[in-house]
């Protein structure tokens, strides 16, 4: 241990700032003894001295209060602050009045002199901090948590009750000090036992390593009595503002915080006798972790043990290791504060986790559902670049000021409701090697280095270069068959092994050596690509590439494919059903082009082999569902077969095998959610939203006319036909759709919770107005970039609170007509909710510019299905009255097509739809 520093007065000419720097330099290794200023030579504005806590010494600066005096209480608070940061496991929380201060006086016989008033402290003194004998052991055990709302990107569990934290974002609370996670409902029950491991600093590292000197002032004690009164000041530099002065609290200064249970309750509980737990076998209805080893309690029932008194949960194997610290049933104001109090209670509507069962399917894709879209939407605040950086700062949610002007609703994101699927790397080489072939146009057998990936077969000149002879796209391969006798084989030449047929040429691949001159050594495959073994491996590899999504373990026959014998093709266009048609002979599926995934399958990109037309192919694995749900798998196909509308995605055909269903649809550009999230502000302007919503409503009107309710309407299921700023949109994904009559109700579980009406969430009967609620949510998320409801509150209560639903940011920029339409769509009572035609007639959608944009779209696609001829004269008259320009080509179109039989037929059909819906 080094000798204590020599205390000596500095030179009288030493400036005040230099004296502070010299005092700070005393803690730097190798800087020699610490020079102290002469007593009474206080720098302007405060007294500079050192605080000694055990073996740690810190320079501090005591500032004057507004009355010009010094306060001893501020010195005690400063000492507690140093202990909290350097020794968080021994925090002095609330012990300001139990700290004694002693001044080192080498000239006195008793070196330590008790400091009774602040004036006893002189410039350059060394003050020893001693804990009074009146401090009890319980005082050291009480360390409150710093709880802040946190968004988790992976499933997490409450460290108090052990149950999973449910929800999409802001699922629970995280302590800044110890990093533990809790339910919001558990906040009042959490014991004040924070360990502070996340913000712990090595006790042998001085806080002055940051180049700062601690200061204390009485100016802030009234506003924040429990905060450390610290203001870092760099020697020789200007002092920072008080708002930047709280080290260790810089990150969450503006975030919504929660407080734990009262400290008086902890003192009361510490006086209770701790006894062994009384464990009994328990069955849990929700995912729960062992509160001893923090691992999941696995199983369907009787997963673990629970204490009858305090509800502590653990594994059977962990029970002997649990300490005897049961406090029994602890209640305050009639409420049970034990850890697992709600572990076997079914939650009611309006509680924090009332979506737990409904959202269970969402947890499989929590990492995918909250990727960069969510990070960008949440990053609205700024993190202070303070010295004590949180090691988990990249996973903290950004600072969000809680005020009436800011929306705290869930940010808009892509909600995935399927089993997690990872996207394969594009252009992955599936097989490569030397191979020989000749064609129907050239009988000369050639040898190339073949490389097979997910989209093509490339014939390279050699195995290292990039120059290639030919590329055979897999989408152009019409047939893969074993070798047949051919007249093209030269006399005396060896026959080929298999054939690849395209529209223009047939490739005869491989060479079957009938009479080999010498067998290859050790039965190894010849490197030249000759022989039946190497050809057989290539045939199997190409067959798998042509049908990349066949079930694992299925055999691929070289002759008659096993799928061809049992597959069925249903053509939607002409209602023809063909037996023994394999989808791989008609379409090429690209396994690395995943367009999306839904409740019942994955959607891949594909191509028609003969025409080269791009398609989207949804592949449904029937083995994932019970037999009784197979009818639901075909529900989408059955509905789309009867739908032919420009606003609904076109279904081409369907293939079915015992294991899978292949639904082939037209391929579009993207979806509406991608358009919203990629926009400049993360939300759409009103004129674009009107344009898209009108098209959605027209498609819905056609569905409702046929008594079809979509039941899962959301931006992900609204596809864009092009990348234009004003694109055509089409509805897709009818897996949840239902046939519901005009006055009928259904009760089956449907849809995505974030877009579902309250009657579905409450398991009540619903009708076609369910889709209109979803339209209201789509309008809301399009204009604001957030979901309209917070998961913590009852939907009905939130709707009644206009300040909550429509905070000034961003709703002050949005018209009152849009808000009025949203209010009429988000009606909890179904009979008050707007219908399709009433929504289309709303003033917000009856907009001249929107009508012009829709007419231009109809002119581009060559079909009029959104607007009606009867409105032409009205809008033309409106343009004349308002002095607006009416496009001349629209006048000519209405004059030329107004009297045609086709126009009359379309008009009568549209009129009948409106009358039927009304």
UniProtKB/Swiss-Prot annotation:
ATP binds at residues 595-603, 618. Its main location: cytoplasm. SUPFAM superfamilies: Cysteine-rich domain, PH domain-like, Protein kinase-like (PK-like). Residues 338-362, 380-408 are annotated as: Disordered. The active site is at 712 (proton acceptor). Residues 428-547 form the PH domain. Pfam families: C1_1, PH, Pkinase. Its EC number is 2.7.11.13. One of its GO terms (biological process) is positive regulation of protein export from nucleus. Residues 345-355, 387-396 have a biased composition (Acidic residues). It is found in: Cytoplasm; Cell membrane; Golgi apparatus, trans-Golgi network. Activated by DAG and phorbol esters. Phorbol-ester/DAG-type domain 1 binds DAG with high affinity and appears to play the dominant role in mediating translocation to the cell membrane and trans-Golgi network. Phorbol-ester/DAG-type domain 2 binds phorbol ester with higher affinity. Autophosphorylation of Ser-748 and phosphorylation of Ser-744 by PKC relieves auto-inhibition by the PH domain. Phosphorylation on Tyr-469 by the SRC-ABL1 pathway in response to oxidative stress, is also required for activation. Activated by DAPK1 under oxidative stress. A zinc finger (Phorbol-ester/DAG-type) spans 144-194, 276-326. Gene3D superfamilies: 3.30.60.20, Pleckstrin-homology domain (PH domain)/Phosphotyrosine-binding domain (PTB) (2.30.29.30), Transferase(Phosphotransferase) domain 1 (1.10.510.10). The modification Phosphoserine is found at residues 203, 206, 217, 221, 351, 403, 407, 454, 554, 744, 748, 916. It catalyses: L-seryl-[protein] + ATP = O-phospho-L-seryl-[protein] + ADP + H(+); L-threonyl-[protein] + ATP = O-phospho-L-threonyl-[protein] + ADP + H(+). InterPro entries: C1-like_sf, DAG/PE-bd, Kinase-like_dom_sf, PE/DAG-bd, PH-like_dom_sf, PH_domain, Prot_kinase_dom, Protein_kinase_ATP_BS. Residues 589-845 form the Protein kinase domain. GO terms for molecular function: ATP binding; diacylglycerol-dependent serine/threonine kinase activity; heat shock protein binding; identical protein binding; kinase activity; phosphatidylinositol 3-kinase activator activity; protein kinase activity; protein kinase C binding. The modification Phosphotyrosine is found at residues 93, 438, 469, 508, 755. Phosphorylated at Ser-403 and Ser-407 by MAPK13 during regulation of insulin secretion in pancreatic beta cells. Phosphorylated by DAPK1. Phosphorylated at Tyr-93 and by ABL at Tyr-469, which primes the kinase in response to oxidative stress, and promotes a second step activating phosphorylation at Ser-744/Ser-748 by PKRD. Phosphorylated on Ser-916 upon S.enterica infection in macrophages. It comes from the Eukaryota. Keywords: Angiogenesis, Apoptosis, ATP-binding, Cell membrane, Cytoplasm, Differentiation, Golgi apparatus, Immunity, Inflammatory response, Innate immunity, Kinase, Magnesium, Membrane, Metal-binding, Neurogenesis, Nucleotide-binding, Phosphoprotein, Repeat, Serine/threonine-protein kinase, Transferase, Zinc, Zinc-finger. Interacts (via N-terminus) with ADAP1/CENTA1. Interacts with MAPK13. Interacts with DAPK1 in an oxidative stress-regulated manner. Interacts with USP28; the interaction induces phosphorylation of USP28 and activated KRAS-mediated stabilization of ZNF304. Interacts with AKAP13 (via C-terminal domain). Serine/threonine-protein kinase that converts transient diacylglycerol (DAG) signals into prolonged physiological effects downstream of PKC, and is involved in the regulation of MAPK8/JNK1 and Ras signaling, Golgi membrane integrity and trafficking, cell survival through NF-kappa-B activation, cell migration, cell differentiation by mediating HDAC7 nuclear export, cell proliferation via MAPK1/3 (ERK1/2) signaling, and plays a role in cardiac hypertrophy, VEGFA-induced angiogenesis, genotoxic-induced apoptosis and flagellin-stimulated inflammatory response. This is Serine/threonine-protein kinase D1. It comes from Rattus norvegicus. The lineage of its organism: Eukaryota, Metazoa, Chordata, Craniata, Vertebrata.
């Amino acid at each position: 241990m080094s000798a204590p520093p020599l205390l000596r007065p500095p030179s009288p000419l030493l400036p005040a700032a230099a004296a502070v720097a010299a005092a700070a330099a005393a803690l730097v290794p190798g800087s020699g003894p610490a020079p102290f200023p002469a007593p009474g030579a206080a720098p302007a504005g405060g007294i500079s001295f050192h605080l000694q806590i055990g073996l740690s010494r810190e320079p501090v600066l005591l500032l004057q209060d507004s009355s010009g005096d010094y306060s001893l209480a501020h010195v005690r608070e400063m000492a507690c602050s140093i202990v909290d940061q350097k020794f968080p496991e021994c925090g002095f929380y609330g012990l300001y009045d139990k700290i004694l201060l002693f001044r080192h006086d080498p000239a006195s016989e008793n070196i330590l002199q008790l400091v009774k008033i602040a004036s006893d402290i002189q410039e350059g003194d060394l003050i020893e901090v001693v804990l009074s004998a009146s401090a009890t052991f319980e005082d050291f055990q009480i360390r409150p948590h710093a709880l802040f709302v946190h968004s988790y990107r992976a499933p997490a569990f409450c460290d108090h009750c052990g149950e999973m934290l449910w929800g999409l974002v802001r699922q629970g609370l995280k302590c800044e000090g110890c990093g533990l996670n809790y339910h919001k409902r558990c906040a009042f029950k959490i014991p004040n036992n924070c360990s502070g491991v996340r913000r712990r600093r090595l006790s042998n590292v001085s806080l002055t390593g940051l180049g700062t000197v601690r200061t204390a002032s009485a100016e802030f004690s009234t506003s924040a009595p429990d905060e450390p009164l610290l203001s870092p000041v760099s020697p020789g530099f200007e002092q920072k503002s008080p708002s930047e002065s709280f080290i260790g609290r810089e990150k969450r200064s503006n975030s919504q915080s929660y407080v734990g249970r009262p400290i008086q309750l902890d003192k009361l509980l510490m006086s209770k006798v701790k006894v062994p737990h009384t464990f009994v076998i328990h069955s849990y209805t929700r995912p729960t972790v062992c509160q001893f080893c923090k691992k999941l309690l696995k199983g369907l029932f009787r997963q673990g043990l629970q204490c009858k008194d305090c509800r502590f949960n653990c594994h059977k194997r962990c029970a002997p290791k649990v300490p005897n610290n049961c406090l029994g049933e602890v209640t305050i104001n009639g409420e049970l504060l034990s850890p697992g109090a709600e572990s076997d209670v079914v939650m009611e509507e309006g509680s924090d986790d009332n979506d737990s069962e409904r959202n269970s399917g969402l947890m499989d894709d929590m990492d995918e559902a909250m990727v960069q879209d969510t990070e960008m939407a949440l990053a609205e605040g700024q993190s202070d670049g303070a010295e004590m950086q949180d090691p988990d700062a990249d996973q903290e949610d950004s600072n969000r000021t809680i005020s009436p002007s800011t929306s705290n609703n869930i940010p808009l994101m892509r909600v995935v409701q399927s089993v997690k699927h990872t996207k394969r790397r594009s252009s992955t080489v599936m097989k490569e090697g030397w191979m020989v072939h000749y064609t129907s146009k050239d009988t000369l057998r050639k040898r190339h280095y073949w490389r097979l990936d997910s989209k093509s077969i490339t014939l390279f000149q050699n195995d290292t270069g990039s120059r290639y002879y030919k590329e055979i796209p897999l989408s152009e391969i019409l047939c893969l068959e074993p070798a047949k006798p051919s007249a093209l084989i030269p006399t005396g030449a060896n026959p080929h092994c298999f054939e690849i047929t395209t529209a223009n040429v047939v490739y005869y691949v491989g060479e079957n050596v009938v009479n080999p001159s010498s067998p290859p050594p050790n039965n190894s495959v010849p490197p030249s690509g000759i022989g039946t073994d190497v050809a057989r491996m290539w045939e199997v590899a190409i067959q798998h590439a042509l049908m990349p999504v066949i079930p694992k373990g299925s055999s691929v026959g070289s002759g008659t494919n096993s799928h061809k014998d049992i597959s069925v093709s249903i053509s939607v266009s002409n209602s023809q059903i063909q037996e023994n048609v394999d989808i791989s002979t008609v379409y090429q599926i690209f396994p690395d082009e995943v367009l999306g995934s839904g409740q019942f399958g994955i959607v891949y990109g594909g191509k028609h082999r003969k025409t080269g037309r791009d398609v989207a192919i949804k592949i449904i694995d029937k083995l994932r569902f019970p037999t009784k749900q197979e009818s639901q798998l075909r529900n989408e196909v059955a509905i789309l077969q009867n739908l032919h509308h420009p606003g609904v995605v076109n279904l081409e055909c369907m293939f079915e095998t015992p294991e899978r269903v292949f639904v082939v649809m037209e391929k579009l550009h993207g979806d509406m959610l991608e358009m919203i999230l990629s926009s400049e502000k993360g939300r759409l302007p009103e004129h674009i939203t009107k344009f898209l919503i009108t098209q959605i409503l027209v498609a819905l009107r056609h569905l409702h006319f046929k008594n079809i309710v979509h039941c899962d309407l959301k931006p992900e299921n609204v596809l864009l036909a092009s990348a234009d700023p004003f694109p055509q949109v089409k509805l897709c994904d009818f897996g949840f759709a239902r046939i519901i009559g005009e006055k009928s109700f259904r009760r089956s579980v449907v849809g995505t919770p974030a877009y579902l009406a309250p009657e579905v969430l409450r398991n009540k009967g619903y009708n076609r107005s369910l889709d209109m609620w979803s339209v209201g949510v789509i309008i809301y998320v399009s204009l604001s970039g957030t979901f309209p409801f917070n998961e913590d509150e009852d939907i009905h209560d939130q709707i009644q609170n206009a300040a909550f639903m429509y905070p000034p940011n961003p709703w002050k920029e949005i018209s009152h007509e849009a808000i009025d339409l949203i209010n009429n769509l988000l009606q909890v009572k179904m009979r008050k909710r707007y219908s399709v035609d009433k929504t289309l007639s709303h003033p917000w959608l009856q907009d001249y510019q929107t009508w012009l944009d829709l007419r231009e779209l109809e002119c581009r696609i060559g079909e009029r299905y959104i607007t009606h001829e009867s409105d032409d004269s009205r809008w033309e008259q409106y343009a004349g009255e308002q002095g607006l320009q009416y496009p001349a080509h629209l006048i000519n179109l209405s004059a030329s097509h107004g009297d045609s039989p086709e126009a009359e037929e379309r008009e009568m059909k549209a009129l009948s739809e409106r009358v039927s819906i009304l």
